[in-house]
Amino acid sequence: MRVVVNPAHDPSAVAPPSAEARAYHASLPGYAPTPLRPLPGLADELGLGAVALKDESARLGLPAFKVLGASWAVERALRERPEVHTLVAASAGNHGRAVAHVAALRGLAARILLPARSAPARRAAIAAEGAELVVVDGDYEDAVRQAAEDGARDGCLEVADVGDSGPAHWVVDGYATLFTELGEAFDVVLVPTGVGSLAAAAARYGAMAGAAVIAVEPVAAACLAASLAAGAPTRVATPGTGMAGLDCAEVSAAAWPDLRAGIAGGVTVDDAEAQAAMRELAALGLAIGDCGAAALAALRALATEDAAAPLRAAVGLGAASRVLLIATEGPTDPDAYARATGAAEPRGAA
């Protein structure tokens, strides 16, 4: 576990959240706000006022929040480029599946590029959406580079959630819907962070609502923690992590300004800590994948470990604090989930 306090934290410099995407999402078939799960036992154990978990394990027919960003980015792009016939995206799994799903809904083709170490279950889920699947001989960043080349072809659109393109910005705007659904106020928000698009949306919410936002990253892919410490986007080596959706070497340029100003600090967790959190949530009847469970692992470290004292003080975490955990995904790799929790994915989870 590593903790970083952001020396450049300045919520007044954060952009306001987009309100336009929520109206669009509400028009989609099957849209409903995802549930907020209270965790009173955890709050009592850690000496906090309240803890709640935003459960993104079932969002518009998919097991992750990513469809909020992908659907809005595609909608905005097609308004400008109605001639597009193929959507292209690089992904560690969830974003690609979301883009493929949106393509199928809109009668478009999809070409999804995945890194070599992507799990077979995630590949199969994307293929099941009808997409052309390309496994790149390299890491996530190699897939991103190939997607940019493929997306530049005639009739193609790269739906990127990283970089500085229009879609990369619209993805951040689309994620605002997750936070506009909250019906209560929180003091501290812990958000799993890969390239930082969701964390940027969280930062916008936090700046508006007066909540401190903490980024949660894998120890093995802590590109935002490195960037906050350096004061500039910093690429890191990524040897691999079970938190596949967070296995990113650099933050998105579209997200960076709001991350730098709006993230109070960061906590890194390792795979063992994320898996322990998965087991804890499974015991409560909540089927949450590695990336989503990382938020719980980070809260435990933040609330109890001596090394986290500077960040605890910076965000004012204490007996009256109301804490929100963003559980970004359900089990997207069933075999890995079973190995981590000792059981198959719960059905009809609370």
Residue positions per predicted region:
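PLP-dependent amino-acid enzyme catalytic core
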Residues: 1-350
